[in-house]
C-alpha cells in the first residue's frame, strides 16, 4: 500500500451518525405566507464576524418556484452542480430506513453522497461496497464489492456518478471503476496512481476524477481510456475529502486542494484560465490549508467557488475574470437558486448573497458549540440544500434545521439520535439523509 494511502488513516474524523428522523412537520416548519425582506476539524479557518451589507437593507429575496427533480446522478446533483429550487412534499413522512453497509470508524470514513438515476438509488459504503436500491421502497437490487484482493478494505474513498447506464466510482486504492448500473458487473478499471477523496463527474461520455496529488484525469466513459490529464500544485497537507469537478458548456472546472481553480476544455484539456482562492490571512491556524473542498458551481456562464482559505468568488467561465469576491471561507458546497447563493461558512454562519453582485442580504449564526459557555464540543454543519422554500442543514450534534431562504429565520428543527456529515439529497419528491453509521432514511 502506498504511503499516501497509509497517511490518510491518520486524519482526524468525526464519529457521528444520523438516526431516525421524527416530527417532520415540526422539522420543515410552517411555510411563510409571504416572504419577508431581507469544521469538521479543529484547524478550520476562523473568520471575523460577517454582517449583511447596508445597501441590502429592505431587499426582498424572490426565488423561482420549486420544481420536481427526478434524478440526482452525481455528487452535487448534476454535472454543473446548479440544482436551484427543488420540490418535496408538504407533509414529509418517513417511507423507509435501510443500512447501506459499513459506516465510519476509527480507520474508515463514509464519504460518498448517494446518487439517484432511473428509479434506482446507488450508494458506496466505507469498505467500497457499491449497492443499488429501489428508491420507492429501499429494497436492495444488487451489491458489489470492488476492492481488489491485494488491497485493504479500510481505505477512504471518493464517491459515485452515473451516466449512460453506468455507475462510476472513485476509490482510495487509486482506481476509477465503472459498473453496469443494471447488474453491478464491473465493466472496466483504470489505475490513476493515487487515492481519490472526491466523487467523479460524468458528462458527455467523459469521466473526470481528481487524485489527492491534485491530478485531474479525463477518462473515456465507455472504455476507461485516459483522454488527457492536468496537474495542479501538489499539497503535502490537505483536508479530508475534496471537491468534484464542475462541467458545463464544454468546460471543466477543477478544484484543487492547493486552492487552485482551473478551467480546461473538455475536449482536450487545454487550460483556459487559472485562479487561486488561497486567501492566506495572518494569525490563522490553517493558512496553508486553502483546500477547495466544496464543489464549484457553473451557472449561466459564471463559476462560483469557495475555499477553506477564506475566499468566495464569482468568476467568468470563459475569461477567468473575477466578477466579485468575498472574504468568506468554507468547506461545504454553495447552493444557487435563481439570483441568489446560500453558503455555510467555517464560522458556522449561513449566508445569503446576490448571484451577480456578491451582496450579503442576511446572515444567520448557527449553533457553534455544544457547550457555548465553555466553548467546548465544536459543532459542524453540512448543507444547505433548498427544497420547497426551506433551506435544510444538518449538524454533528444530531440536529437538523430548516430555515427560511428569504430572511434566514429558523422554521423548524428536530433532534436526531446522532449527526450527519454528508449533505442530504432530493429526488422524486423525496428527501434522503445518510448517516455516518451508514443508515439511509427516505422521507416523502
Regions found by a protein language model. Name each.
Residues 96-115, 143-161, 187-203, 226-248, ...:
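Extracytoplasmic beta-rich repeat domains
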Residues 131, 177, 217, 262, ...:
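WD40 beta-propeller blade core
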Residues 34-52, 58-95, 271:
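Blade/loop signatures of beta-propeller domains
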Residues 125-126, 155, 164, 171-172, ...:
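Structural signature of WD-repeat beta-propellers
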Residues 134-138, 180-183, 220-224, 266-269, ...:
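Short loop/turn segments that connect beta-strands within beta-propeller blades
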Residues 20-23:
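C-terminal motif of bacterial Sec signal peptides marking the signal peptidase cleavage site
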Residues 25-28:
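Bacterial signal peptide processing site
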Amino acid at each position: 500500500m502506498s504511503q499516501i494511502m497509509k497517511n490518510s488513516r491518520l486524519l482526524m474524523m468525526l464519529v457521528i451518525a444520523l438516526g431516525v428522523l421524527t416530527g417532520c412537520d415540526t422539522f420543515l416548519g410552517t411555510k411563510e405566507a409571504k416572504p419577508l425582506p431581507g469544521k469538521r476539524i479543529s484547524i478550520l479557518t476562523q473568520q471575523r464576524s460577517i454582517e449583511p451589507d447596508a445597501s441590502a437593507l429592505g431587499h426582498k429575496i424572490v426565488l423561482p418556484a420549486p420544481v420536481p427533480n427526478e434524478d440526482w446522478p452525481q455528487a452535487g446533483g448534476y454535472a454543473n452542480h446548479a440544482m436551484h429550487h427543488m420540490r418535496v412534499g408538504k407533509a414529509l413522512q418517513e417511507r423507509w430506513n435501510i443500512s447501506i453497509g459499513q459506516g465510519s470508524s476509527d480507520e474508515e470514513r463514509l464519504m460518498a453522497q448517494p446518487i439517484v438515476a432511473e428509479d434506482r438509488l446507488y450508494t458506496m459504503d466505507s469498505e467500497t461496497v457499491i449497492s443499488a436500491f429501489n428508491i420507492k421502497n429501499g429494497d436492495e437490487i444488487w451489491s458489489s464489492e470492488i476492492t481488489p484482493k491485494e488491497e485493504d478494505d479500510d481505505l477512504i474513498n471518493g464517491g459515485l456518478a452515473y451516466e449512460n447506464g453506468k455507475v462510476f466510482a472513485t476509490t482510495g486504492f487509486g482506481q476509477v471503476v465503472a459498473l453496469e448500473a443494471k447488474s453491478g458487473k464491473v465493466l472496466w478499471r483504470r489505475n490513476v496512481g493515487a487515492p481519490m477523496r472526491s466523487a467523479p463527474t460524468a458528462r458527455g461520455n467523459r469521466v473526470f476524477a481528481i487524485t489527492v496529488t491534485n491530478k485531474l484525469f479525463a477518462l473515456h466513459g465507455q472504455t476507461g481510456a485516459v483522454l488527457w490529464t492536468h496537474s495542479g500544485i501538489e499539497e503535502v497537507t490537505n483536508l479530508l475529502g475534496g471537491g468534484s469537478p464542475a462541467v458545463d458548456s464544454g468546460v471543466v472546472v477543477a478544484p484543487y486542494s492547493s486552492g487552485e481553480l482551473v478551467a480546461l476544455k473538455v475536449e482536450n484539456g487545454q487550460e483556459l484560465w487559472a485562479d487561486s482562492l488561497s486567501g492566506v490571512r495572518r494569525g490563522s491556524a490553517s493558512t496553508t490549508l486553502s483546500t477547495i473542498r466544496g464543489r464549484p458551481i457553473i451557472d449561466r456562464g459564471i463559476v462560483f467557488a469557495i475555499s477553506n482559505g477564506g475566499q468566495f468568488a464569482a468568476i467568468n467561465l470563459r475569461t477567468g475574470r473575477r466578477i466579485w469576491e468575498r472574504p468568506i471561507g468554507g468547506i461545504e458546497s454553495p447552493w444557487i437558486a435563481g439570483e441568489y447563493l446560500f453558503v455555510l461558512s467555517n464560522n458556522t454562519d449561513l449566508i445569503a448573497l446576490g448571484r451577480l453582485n456578491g451582496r450579503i442580504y442576511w446572515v444567520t449564526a448557527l449553533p457553534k458549540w455544544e457547550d457555548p459557555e465553555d466553548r467546548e464540543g465544536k459543532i459542524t454543519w453540512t448543507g444547505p440544500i433548498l427544497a420547497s422554500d426551506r433551506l435544510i442543514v444538518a449538524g454533528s450534534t444530531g440536529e437538523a434545521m430548516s430555515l427560511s431562504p428569504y430572511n434566514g429565520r429558523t422554521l423548524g428543527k428536530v433532534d436526531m439520535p446522532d449527526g450527519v456529515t454528508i449533505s442530504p439529497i432530493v429526488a422524486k419528491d423525496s428527501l434522503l439523509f445518510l448517516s455516518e453509521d451508514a443508515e439511509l432514511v427516505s422521507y416523502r
